[in-house]
Structure formats: C-alpha cells, structure tokens
A protein has these predicted regions:
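Conserved pre-motif I regulatory segment
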Residues: 91-136
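Conserved P-loop/Walker A NTP-binding site and adjacent catalytic elements of P-loop NTPases
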Residues: 118-176
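N-terminal accessory nucleic-acid engagement/regulatory domains that precede
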Residues: 1-93
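A short alpha-helix capping/helix-coil boundary motif
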Residues: 78-82, 99-103, 113, 153-157
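Short glycine-/small-residue-rich flexible loop motifs, especially phosphate/cofactor-binding loops
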Residues: 57, 100, 176
C-alpha cells in the first residue's frame, strides 16, 4: 500500500487543500484551526479526523483500527473542534458557547443563580474549558445540569463517549 507522507506533499498543495477543508467544513470546525500544520504533520490522520467530523451522527466514534494506526486522530479532532479560538468564529460561538448550548440542549435562556452567584455558569464554563473543579451547590442549585451540559457538548464536538458518574438522586429519578 502507498503511504502519504508530509514529504510527498508540496507547500502549494497543502495550502490548496487547507483552503478547501476550511470552506467545506466551515460549520464543523474552528475557522482559525491551523489546517496547514495538521495537513503537513499528519495528512492521513487529518483525513480520518475529517471523515468523522463530517458525519452528522454524533454517536459515530473513531474506529479502533484507525486509533491503533493513527492515534493522532483524537488530538486532531480536539484541535479542530474543541479548541476555542480567541477571535470567536461562527463555529466556536455556536458549538463551544455554554449559553448557546444551554438554550439549544435544555431550552433555558439563562443559568440559575444562587444568592446572586452564577454557580452553574461558572462550573459549566470551567468544565468546558477543561479545568479541574470542585463545585459545591446547595440543594436545588442545578448540579445535574452542570454535569450534563459540558458532557453533552464534549460528546457533540469530539464524537466521543462521556461518562458522568453522579450519586445525585435527582439524576437517577428525573433524568434517566
């Protein structure tokens, strides 16, 4: 079998392919992702990542064979779909914004506050940003949503499985 390597691809071809990818996947990836670098470093890994990203089925996951032979695919998907740009492109504003997803996934216009503190919003944003956090909420403070929103957002952007382990009875009674 023939293998595509960065050595066999010209700079001009990488730029053309990068422009094509950005135009074809504009609603599926960050507009400011460094496609030329990814194409130069791992053209096959990028191709597999784009194949998965291009599906509308959020339950599609990376096949084991691909992960075995191209382990960088998961990192490429993360770089394209889950690394929020500083300029705020259309994709990032839609897919990585907790307020937009709160409305889209749960139908709520705003996060709940407790004594004027936006606990849900702060904890959800920290989780989406990949920060380690400990959130202590009062009863009825919205812990369930704080677990679920980031997990659902991750699943949609990364095409992965998220497991939320929670002893909360409200999750077991109301949402399962």
């Amino acid at each position: 079998t023939d293998t595509i390597s960065a050595d066999t691809i010209s700079d001009h071809a990488i730029i053309e392919v990068s422009e094509y990818i950005l135009s074809e996947y504009k609603n599926h990836i960050c507009a400011h992702a460094d496609i030329p670098a990814l194409a130069a470093q791992s053209p096959c890994g990028l191709a597999y990542a784009l194949a998965l990203i291009g599906t509308d089925d959020y339950q599609s996951v990376t096949p084991g064979w691909v992960l075995c032979h191209y382990p960088e695919v998961e990192h490429i998907i993360y770089m394209l779909c889950h690394t929020q740009c500083t300029d705020g492109c259309e994709y990032c504003n839609r897919m990585l914004d907790i307020h937009h997803n709160l409305k889209q996934l749960f139908g709520y216009d705003a996060f709940r506050t407790y004594d004027g503190e936006p606990l849900q919003e702060q904890a959800s944003q920290a989780a989406v940003d990949g920060k380690s956090l400990l959130a202590i909420f009062p009863t009825g403070g919205g812990k369930s949503l704080t677990f679920q929103l980031p997990a659902l957002m991750d699943g949609r952007t990364l095409h992965g499985l998220n497991v939320v382990i929670s002893p909360l009875q409200s999750v077991m009674k109301d949402q399962v």
